[in-house]
Amino acid sequence: TKGDKGISAAPFLNSYHRLDMYPQSMTWKLGDPIVDFQPLKGTTNEVGALFASLNFFDEMLYQKFTRESGNPLIKLKKFSESFGELVFPVVDFANYLGISLTDIQFLLYELTEFGFIDYDNDRMIITCYPKMFDYIDAQSGLKDFDKIIIQSKASVNAQLSLSSLDLKINGIERVLLSQAKKVWIMPTNNQLIVKKNRDMNFDGLITAGKTQYYGDGFSFLYEDFKLNLSKCDSMFIWADYKESKKAGQLVRSPSVIESLNGYIQIDDMDNKSGRDTSMHAFPKLYSNVETYVYYDDPSIQNGIYSRDNFMFIINPFVLDSLDKFTNQALSLNGTFMSGGIFPDFIDSLSLQEDYSLGFIRNTPSDGFNIYSQLASYDNEIRLSNEGLKGSGTIEFHTTTALSEDVTFYPDSLSAIAHTFTNIKQEDDPEIPLVKGQNCQVKYVPKENQLYANSIEDKFIFFDDEEADLTGGIVLGYDGLKGDGIMRFGKGEVQSLLYTYETDAILSDTAEFRLVSSDKDLDALSFKTQNLNARVDFGTRIGEFKSNSGESFVTFPENEYICYMDQFNWFMDNDDLEMKNSKQAAADINIDTDLDLAVSNFYSINPDQDSINFGSSKARFDVRRKKITCTKIEFIKIADSRIVP
């Protein structure tokens, strides 16, 4: 057991592991293969114990003993050298100093407590330990030293295996290996194994300057002064804050470098103290194998980039000055695999605006084919924890889109295109000229289709730019399709599915409307539904046929309704021709004695007492808002019939 002060507090000297050990007690049961170092029996709380390297040096401790007459360590050294022995009588040393035994004893107790000497009070003998000479040489700059102290706070501070001679130390928060280079370790389960001459095995965390490493099977080699990273699961980098108000502070990069195998050279093996500050390259990381950065974290585009095929493979590398490299200096060469979005290409990782590891690069002059398809992309590619993004030109079939905001997903491309152009194709299938601005674009390679949707600006169609679309279009090798509202002059068509020719709009099921004027597009003068539509800008005629026999037609401004099955709109004249080749609709229950063979017209003005009449043909003048009906047999008003 040990005491708290003086000779009783002197450390256990461990020459195999080369440690001064400061536990309260050492316990060994006869025949037991384990020696325990622990607090004294009866101690209820966990008690701290120190395990210090025999080459540990603390200048404050050295100066603690310095007096006006000098430092007693130097006097002990000089006397030992003059005496020619490391062991000598206390009386002789007291006479050498010219002081009494009583005056010197307290100093000798204190020097013994810190492991510089051994003072045998019974035999009145002083034994000088190597630590004393090392401290003097370290203070003088003649000898290197270290700063390694292991602090333990546990119910059992350490255990020595008599079979392997491994010293397992428990209750460790962290161990500083180099103060100058900012290297320390934090072992898993707060324990590590000390091997011969201060070598250590441990799992857990290593911090080396602005880098951190998590893993198992780590080892510290004292003589070489390096850390072996045999199984490093993950490496993190701490970057300098870019904001001026946070200058000098660090932020951890969200990117993880995985599967690292290599070692960290903490400092030159003869500069464990870090006193020689000219060695700027240390600490230095040597990565001996390919390492990987993945982008499958849920915070990155909801984790859509699978680590199975989307990664940056870093070549073996050397990274020096781990404690002071700049954001701009970090560059890790390797190969980017995008899961088939782009061809694999060589590049280098660096710190991005969000502090993640990524890159900004341009495509080759002729662009990249994307998704192994006929589509291509040209200009800037950006990789960060925002995902795989870019700003450039997207080309597919007859479409070219320019965007400053492109996001590449494994199964698709999404962009806000500030310019969208689909050139006209007169060969089969016919495709019209389409232009757009500030639209949403999505390319789906498995479907071989490009989708575009208007946001605020409409798509402009055809050579003369006579039609526009509020909605979406789909381009494939089978042609162009669309949905939404198409407007042309005073007419508009609404459909869930359009097909197109170079100068025509087609739809199997559509709603057709005419507006009162170009300025007021919400003031309807004509409306009908469920039509097969063809609007031809070559002939300047819109042809509409009812899909249900007759279509219900509304004239809001005229306050009339009718049923017709064919409509021809002559867009240059703003003139609509309506025909009915079938029986009048019979599902409107209006009291009338007419037995018409053509569709009925009905007034919906409550003051006109449900005026109705039959007409198989009519015209509607959009400009004048005038309905002209022909082949009317009579109009019944009250008890009278009017024959026009």
PLM regions: where:
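Structural signature for solvent-exposed beta-strand/loop edge elements and short helix-capping sites
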Residues: T1-P644
